UniProtKB/Swiss-Prot annotation:
Keyword annotations of the record: Amino-acid biosynthesis, Arginine biosynthesis, ATP-binding, Glutamine amidotransferase, Ligase, Nucleotide-binding, Pyrimidine biosynthesis
InterPro entries given in the database record: Anth_synth/Amidotransfase, CarbamoylP_synth_ssu, CarbamoylP_synth_ssu_N, CarbP_synth_ssu_N_sf, Class_I_gatase-like, CPSase_GATase1, GATASE
Gene Ontology process terms (BP): 'de novo' pyrimidine nucleobase biosynthetic process; 'de novo' UMP biosynthetic process; glutamine metabolic process; L-arginine biosynthetic process
Disulfide bonds listed in the record: none
Principal EC category: ligase
Name this protein carries in UniProt: Carbamoyl phosphate synthase small chain
Organism: Sulfolobus acidocaldarius (strain ATCC 33909 / DSM 639 / JCM 8929 / NBRC 15157 / NCIMB 11770)
Binding site for L-glutamine: S52, G233, G235, L262, Q265, N303, G305, Y306
Documented EC number(s): 6.3.5.5
CDD domains for the chain: GATase1_CPSase
Amino acid sequence: MDYYNNDTPGYVYLEDGTLMKGIGFGAKGIRVGEIVFTTSMNGYPESLTDPSYKGQILVITHPLIGNYGVPEKNYVNGILTNFESERIQAEGLVISELTEPFKWNSKQTLHEWLLSEGIPGVYGIDTRAVVKRVRSRGVMMGIIASGVEVNNPEEYLKKKYDEMNFIQYTSPKAPIIHQGKTGDVVVVVDCGIKHGILYQLYLRGFTVVRVPCNYSADKIMDFYPKGLLFSNGPGNPNLLTDLVKNFREIIEYNLPTLGICLGHQIATMALGGKVKKMKFGHRAINKPVIDTTTGKSYITTHNHGYAILSKQDVPIHTRVWFYNPDDGTVEGWIHEKYNIITTQFHPEARPGPWDVTWVFDKFKKMVVGDA
């Protein structure tokens, strides 16, 4: 619905030379990023603020976006309950139709939100065509432009997503403490954690200490943690050699440890497993996983472009905990020597189903000694 201004030109330029014209909204400008898509029907405030989307241009396949607007931020003990970080992390947004909001708690439109945060958007794009191209050719770099023409796109596209370290922008510069109801401290090695994960830890009474991702094992142990969580985050995990080294050092303390998404990948590489780039990744809120310990199937939220592609790539002394029946990717493992569990998917969802929030209950039992 053209409810604010339909005169702003918008462009999406793909690395393979494809140029698509639409209508710009949000902030005017040009952004460059890896073109990725999500099939989620809702949850655009959470998706856009997910730090894992740093460096990426998000294409949403659902045709109607914006119809419930953008709510006011809500905090519990410094933790956002309706956004995944303090700001939009994606480089830009590509959608089919921008709709006028109609919901009681909407404080601004999607256009106003993107405008206030300096993020360009383009609508009126055949998102199905974009997705078909990405699915057949794989993820690629792209340019999004709102109200500005793109000259010399080849110059912009010299940047390569796989070669850039994005966690320097999403990891905190100093420790952040969220006081819980108990004295049980969980240190989060924060590569760009979603607030949904923080909230699940808070609900279980933990005092959460978020530390920069480059913190050494000695600095982490200064907080006397009873458990560790290695968080999600953006970018190519194979570039994060220092973080892998730190993980190898900290696991010698044998603390109960949970790795989620990027944290799962870091743990995998630290213990000798292999993490590889996927053709177009998993980004959706309806991905199935099978729990090998029970045989049960769960519907889960995914946002990752790298993965353990087969059971042969898991670390030694681990057993596969979850796998995706669609393509066989390993979605979690349990270590047989160290007190470590991991999930590639997001057990906190946000957005998505709450089928596997019990993973945090399992982690709590590990921390308090009942596992």
